[in-house]
Amino acid sequence: MEHLIFLLIFGGYSPSIAQITSSTTTTTPVPAANRRTIRVGVAAVQSTELDSIGWPMSGGAINLAIQKLRDDGFIAAFDFEINVNYTECDRSLGAAVGMEFMRSKKYDVVIGAPCQDPMEIMATMATYYTTPLLAWGLVTDSKFTDAERYPYLTNIMANSLSLGFSLVKLFEMMDWDRVALLYETSPQDYPLSIINDVETAINEYEDYSVNVVVKQAVPSGDLNDAQYISVLNRIKSRCRIVVAVIQTATPRRKYLRMITEQNMVSDEYVHIWLGLRSIGFGKQSAGLTKCELNCLSSGLTPVWEVLPDDGWNERAKLAATRLLVMDLSTDVPDVNYLNTFTSQCGAQVVNPPVSCETEQCKNASTSPPSAFARSLHDVFYLYGLAITNIYNTNPVNLANGQAINDAMQLTFAGDCSAQFFSKKNILTFLGLTGEVSINANNTRVPKLMLYALNENYDQASFMNLTYSLDGGASVSLGYTNEASLWFWYNGKRPLTIPICGFLGTECPQTFVDQYGALVFSIGGVLALAMLFLITCFFYVLRQRKLERDRIDAEWQIPLVKLQVPPKREKERMSKRSIQSGPSNITDTSKMTFDNTFSNYSIFYLDKEPVLSTAHPASNLDRTDYDTFVKLRKLDHDNINKFVGLSIDGAEYLAVWKMCMRGSLQDIIGQGNFSIDPFFMFCVIRDMAEGLKYLHNSFLHVHANLRSGTVLINESWQAKLTDFGLGNLAEEKKPMKRRQLWMAPEVIRGTLLPHQVEKPADIYSLAIIASEVLTRKEAWNMSERKDTVDEIVYRIKKGGPNSIRPDLDMDGVEINHSLLVLIRDCWSEDPTDRPGADIICNLLKNMMPKKGNLMDHVFNILEDYTTNLEVEVEDRTKELTAEKKKADVLLGRMLPKQVAERLKQGQTVEPEGFDSVTVFFSDVVKFTQLSQKCSPFQVVNLLNDLYSNFDAIIEEHGVYKVESIGDGYLCVSGLPQRNGNAHIKCIVELSLDFMAYCKAFKIPHLPREKVELRVGVNSGPCVAGVVGLSMPRYCLFGDTVNTASRMESNGKPSHIHLSAAAYTLLMKHYPNQYNTASRGDVIIKVGPLLGLFRPFQGKGVMETFWVFERNNQFMGNSSNMAYNPENKKKQKNDDEDVDDESSDGSSRAPNTPPMHDVNANSPPRQRKPGPPSSSPTFSKRSVSPILEEKAREIHNEETEALYRQFRRQETLALM
């Protein structure tokens, strides 16, 4: 009982613990009827190849644990039935054994297989069957820490991931970031599993980065030294920190021998062994006796010793001094009990309740316990504590797997400890594997120790690393001086990279080795060096003087280089300076260069114009020279560049860069300067920025600020000039007028220019700003009655009502804050005036918009351009619309193809048509109707009548030639040829006209009827444009005359056809119309209509009437009688203009253009009479082109008449 120690780490005792501890002091016998038998299933490994977890060398630990529990006063009410089945670390066998234990036999508790693969399956099955499952042996993988996945698994082994995080914490403390990972080959890959978790910890650790340069397996046998050497040689060239996972004693000793042979036991190397077996530098004794020679403080035999000595014990011990071992605590509460366990474990395996009867178990009595037998002892001991605690508190929960699992955590309520678990504290007992405590993940809380050998070759704990659930590791140091950890390294921590590098070729050279030759050389050349230094000293002095002269030469300008420009060039620059900006100057010819730069002289320096001011010659010292050098270096957008000073003439000339627009005083003084508020802001802002730059420069003040010293460049940017020359006297005594810009304190005193302070510049800036805002000279002297002396006197007098310029904006809208700022700047008290920095900041906030003045001007021009583009686009649209209207109007007057040629300036040649049909109509008794109407009523009558006629025309392939008074002339077959359909189009048009007239009503004469007389003729015709002014599309030929005669010889409401028209109609459209012969009629043709034909009778002609359509033959065609109610809506004029070509080959028949009167039309209702005795010809017909066409169309008779006409014309000219 004295060997069981409970340690309360983070709280006090609880009632449950009190019950446990009370049972340790008094053991009450339990009646047999009340005793309970715990059925335990053990998934074991029998193979002798797995000695570290083999059941023959491990199973006796359960009997010893049961005996230990009884001796300590626990499990008094329990008996145990142990049932063993073997898995041999096979997954399928593990599944079979798990099914047998948990499903078939339903054991109270199962001790799982000590291998990871079958244990994973059994842990999953335990979750399903809610069976408590105990883990030991090689089960260290981090996946077994998932309490949600394996809630019934309790693992006595610490997980290797915690080992990995603790190792990385050590790396961080020692500043090791380059390591090698070695692991022993094993049938179960147990060392590889640990190394993989270590590598996972290295990758997941966020606070420190470690580079794994080698990850390699080392053989565990004795026959692979060459492979071992190859691995170690690879490490030697890459790193010095070696981490190794080697579990058993023999491979560990071999590792010590191999690193000794490969010279890896120097002060540069650190070898770290990882383990979870609580053995540190020790090993299990070879026999059943306890360690008696050179034992470690843990009671174990050192790993480097073998009996009998093979000659390597001492060398292996020296190699072990280069080792650090990270393992579970090896502290054992009772070394005597450890020795008893070691000697009896093998013999106990055949005793009940284990009762192993195999041959291996019977032979195990002479063998030492396996490497993990102690962990089996501790896990069963832990289970015994848990069931005892449940039996004493709530025996019903003995059948509750979850309650048993929770009881094994040895938890109790109390103050929480965030280091381990946020709601529970953890109790610890000391077992054979050290301190044992289970966390909330049902996994052992690892208390890892870092062991090293001290000067007595005994292991000592130098660090205590405890891993918590949140992934962190807390470190408790076991030393006060780190040098004690590195006792075998002369007290110095090894470096990640040796000083000389991994191959020893990068050692830093000593001073003598590196600089010895130089030291000896220096001794030989000291004399020469001293001489050289003296020479260099004088050379430097000379060079400094030359450099100073060179720098002075930069600002010293020879007078001969300043050339006076010609007078013409002066005038050109003057005009340029005034004209190129936002100004309203109208007469620039009167502006001269002199009044643009009234305060400066103009010169050319290196072909560039410059400005200059004259000063009397004076003595200049070095300070003045340095000032001029600094002046040349001043550079700011609002500071005029100081070019230099000419001092070799009768007077000094200060040269400044040219600003082509002149001074602000001169520009405002012209009186014709127009600016907007933004320009005002820009100028004032530029002056303030320039003044701010000067105040922050070495000058600290301008001291001569006025509108005359503010120049404007081509970009309308204000630049301050005439600064920094305070030590140079003025050529003349300063004019009284300049005092208008001086501050009152300057006027009152006798201050020299270099004594003027910054507030005086602020005052001058305010005066200039008033000039800009009012666009008038300072104090508006041209309109004031006061003289300059009076104003200066009042300024000097000061007082509460001191005089200041008027800020009359003359209707310009300006930010009121700017006016307030200006008034503050010319305050009487200099201390009340704001500084240049404050003024600049305020002006930035007041600016109506960002950007400079040129951007403003460009924006104005851009807006103007945009507006102009919009206006041009609108005007273009209007022009296009008007052009379209004109084209539509022209299309009504002339055929489109004719109009297009005329618009292109081309000649329109007459065109002959072989067959057309001409239509003439006349209103019957129109003269009598006109007498009954007013002129306006006559116009309205004809407009209503002919407008509807025009609409009817659009439904037929007819072209309207003209209408004169009550006469109406149409033609079909031109200008677009339509074969023989022209006769039908005209007949259909005539019938529709007649039908419409029957329905037509005269509004003011409702009883009167409108009747038409229609004449139709078919035949050849010539059409062309006559004249250049008001051209007309006219028809020529006998066909037109005959058609006119048909109309004049017709009858009211009748359609009169000539024989040619009737023959054409009957030939192509027989039986479609009701016709009748009128008989023979005497027809006469008047002059003009017949081409070059005098009054000559046509003679007797047979003519015909067309009455109506013959519906029996025409059917339901579209050529029925016209109904004005069904008339189609007239299309828009824009749609009437088609895309036909100029040759007239594709004109739509329903879109005839409108034309003017044909001069060749015959007079209406001419009485027939005899022909004239002498031929008379129309002058309209005298056209060479028409004459040529006439010769092509008419017969020999026409040609004879033409020759007769030419003879008469010749006689008339004579």
Swiss-Prot record:
Catalysed reaction, written as an equation: GTP = 3',5'-cyclic GMP + diphosphate
Primary location group: membrane
Biological process according to GO: cGMP biosynthetic process; intracellular signal transduction; receptor guanylyl cyclase signaling pathway
UniProt subcellular location: Cell membrane
Bilayer-crossing regions: 518-538
Domain Guanylate cyclase: residue ranges: 917-1047
Chain positions covered by the region annotation Disordered: 1116-1197
InterPro entries, per database record: A/G_cyclase, A/G_cyclase_CS, ANF_lig-bd_rcpt, Cyclic_nucleotide_synthase, Kinase-like_dom_sf, Nucleotide_cyclase, Peripla_BP_I, Prot_kinase_dom
Residue ranges, Cytoplasmic side: 539-1214
A GO CC annotation given for this chain: plasma membrane
Chain intervals with Basic and acidic residues compositional bias: 1186-1197
Record domain Protein kinase: where: 572-859
Top EC category: lyase
Coiled coil (residue ranges): none
Recorded topology in the membrane: Single-pass type I membrane protein
Residues bearing attached sugar chains per UniProt: 85, 363, 441, 464
Signal peptide positions on this chain: 1-18
UniProt biased composition (Acidic residues): 1133-1142
GO MF assignments: ATP binding; GTP binding; guanylate cyclase activity; peptide receptor activity; protein kinase activity
Domain notes from UniProt: The protein kinase domain is predicted to be catalytically inactive.
Protein role: Guanylate cyclase involved in the production of the second messenger cGMP.
Family according to the record: Belongs to the adenylyl cyclase class-4/guanylyl cyclase family.
Stated name of the protein: Receptor-type guanylate cyclase gcy-19
Species of the source: Caenorhabditis briggsae
